């Protein structure tokens, strides 16, 4: 049905889509973490809906993002692996559908769908995104106006850019805002205010720390990214701290 701007604003929900990247469920206290406290995520979980039985067919960054925006498997939206792009002309895309219904649409932060290679964010009234993974400190943001380097920590910057847009948006219309953070994707580089967060905290070894996987499935025994064998530059994306080098 067609609605006037006023009618649409009255019935349409405001949509704020916050994404954290490569964020393990066991690093969220709403899912039982005793080390990582996430009070704001917990509040949303307790007052909203917390999913406990979720699965993904292709857990890489780029295909996951393509699937979320299109509602299609990677082989359908042609975003199968890292390095692929999301064709701006591909249909459907969630933000395009909302835009056609009178929503203001915006995305800030990590896009990772080929912005430098023809994968321009389509269906967004405003977009300002990182190139690929982006940097934690002094990141480069890309928009229709070009590139700009913004001094500071990427999580704070992404949040501030989102807030700036929300404050100046057309309040006669509903909005769809994608606040897509880079963190906590590797390399793990905390912001200045959090760099000493665990300085005086004794972190208990997880019960599986010394597991030899002898009683696990073959697929589990072949898994990489283990602390014992794979905590290296290839895995961390930075040189490991001297204290944890074997």
What does each model-found stretch correspond to?
Residues 1-246:
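Formylglycine-dependent sulfatase
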